[in-house]
Amino acid sequence: MRRPKKYESGEATQYISRRAALRKLQLSLNDFRRLCILKGVYPREPKHRRRAQKGSSEIKVLYHTKDIRFLLHESIVWTLRDYKIFAKKSNRDRAIKDFRNLKRRLALFPEIKLDHIVKERYPTFIDALKDLDDCLTLLFLFSTFPSLHLIPREQSNLCRRLTIEFLHYVIASKSLRKVFISIKGYYFQAEIKGQKVTWIVPHYYPFKPQSRQEVDFKVMSIFVEFYTIMLGFTNFRLFHGLNLAYPPQFPSSVLQDSEESLKDEASFVSDRIAALNFELLRTDKVQEDEEELDIDMELLEQDGDSKRIIKMKQEAQEVSRLRTLFKGLKFFINREVPREPLVILIRSFGGKVSWDSSIFAGSTYDEGDETITHQIVDRPSITTQYISRDYIQPQWVFDCVNQRQLLPTNKYFIGETLPPHLSPFVDSKRDSYIPPEEKALLDPSLIETHAQSDDDSEDEAQEEEETVDQELLDAQLQLAYQQETAEYKKYGGPDGVNEDEEDPDDEDDNEDDDEEEEELDEKTKRLQEEKQKMSVQSGKVHKVNKRQVHKAEVDEHRLQARMVKPRHRNLFRKLIREKQTKEKEEWLLRKKRRTIEANEKEARKTAKREARKEAAAAAAKASKLGK
């Protein structure tokens, strides 16, 4: 029997170094990286590095041996080898100035086909939707780039086209659920086929070239190469699920015989598609209504799942109301406001939107239209204003979507200090610090109704002043009443007779009252004796000692810490440290909040004091002038 040698089995055979993988695949490092990105193969961290590296203590990049064997049978490997052959032959033709042969070779440039890799990595459509977050974020980022050294113009244009198509699907399906504005950009979350897809759209700033190569655009462009194929398949499937024509097309009513459409119909259509302001052509002639979440009412009769199904029904009703949140409202976007994010929001929830035709193609009505209900402005003042519309800041649209209702517009008028813009991606039931502004937004009873305006706030201020005056008047009346009663007791009643001197008629009445009370006491005693057998004694209030309860919890926690297994102690300590840091952060936030509130209170007091001093000085000055 042969004695087994060391490192011939176990963890040593499960991993392979990157250098050995390059020798096995006969590829360069750049081609190997490209192949790993396209196939979704990434380095692994072994449990025991020394065993995996066959006794070597050097830090190496390791891969699973099974993954490298999997790459051996990939057809892309042959295409990458063809790239090397093509480069050598084209350089030779260029050196000998054989341009005819070079032109022929360029026409036969080898192309990588990634269709089979997409099907291989995502066997089902739901798997592709689950991995759509990073895909959309990266493609939206590359769609804003100009032509760079490693990013050709065709790639950025393709990213722009695919992302616009996806936004058209979101608008047509009304699947948008949450939005948020941050420093990074605009966060969007849509619910597609039961899967929550979240992506970021960057802010629209002018491109600033890098002074140093801090970002490897070559690696990122390889990811984009794969994600464009993936998103193309996804858009095709999503569009056909809604009976929309793919690629996107317009009905004949939009393509009227105008000068622009007759000159260049392709550019006319592409501009209108990028505007996101027109409905797309459907494959069926009759336009289908909006998809509604139908719930079988018979399921509510089941006793076991009644609570869960009722909760599902409530959520479905909220979503159906959210889909028509802006229905019947007409918006106009000023030129200083970002157009595309607001168009996505307003159209996804049933509203109509337009802008100045000089900004971008696709506007449907101008600023002078009197049926406009809201005009979105992001400047301190505006010259001409219409009485029939509300002039609001862009945050109102985002907050309405997150709160799933139309908020009052008085807090979002031009020049107003905006309320805090809270993230909808934070769990409201979390065990951490929640600011009072967020509590006020989460509690429906604290949110003002949509019909409230500045007139209501003025009425409230007048009511507060009246209540203050009424309180002062009540205090003066109470003081006068106390003085009057004191004098009444001191000097006697209205006839000059002291209250301590009693009338004989009153004594007879008191005796009759005593007899009636004795009879009632006897009746109550008899009833108590009859019900004595069935009597229920009242319970006593048990006072809880908070210090003892806290001590018992601490002792129990220490006992649990002792009972933790030795192999789990590091994990237990890590969890305890995370909990302590979380509690410390919460305590610091509460302390900071108390400090801010104390400073604000002190500032209000000083302002009131100064106002009183100014009023007193003005009154004294007026009295001097009167004299």
Swiss-Prot record:
Primary localization: nucleus
Signal peptide location: none
Gene Ontology molecular function terms on file: ribonucleoprotein complex binding; RNA binding
Biological process per Gene Ontology, one example term: maturation of 5.8S rRNA from tricistronic rRNA transcript (SSU-rRNA, 5.8S rRNA, LSU-rRNA)
Compositional bias of kind Low complexity: 616-627
GO CC annotation: nucleolus; nucleoplasm; PeBoW complex; preribosome, large subunit precursor
Residues annotated as domain BRCT: 321-414
Biased composition (Basic residues): 540-549
Phosphoserine PTM positions: S453, S457
SMART domains reported for this sequence: BRCT (SM00292)
Sequence ranges of Acidic residues compositional bias: 454-469, 497-521
Coiled-coil stretches noted in the UniProt entry, renumbered to this chain: 507-538, 589-625
Matching Pfam families: BRCT_2, Pescadillo_N
Role noted for this protein: Required for maturation of ribosomal RNAs and formation of the large ribosomal subunit.
HAMAP family for the chain: Pescadillo
Family: Belongs to the pescadillo family.
Designated name of the protein: Pescadillo homolog
High-level lineage: Eukaryota, Metazoa, Ecdysozoa, Arthropoda, Hexapoda
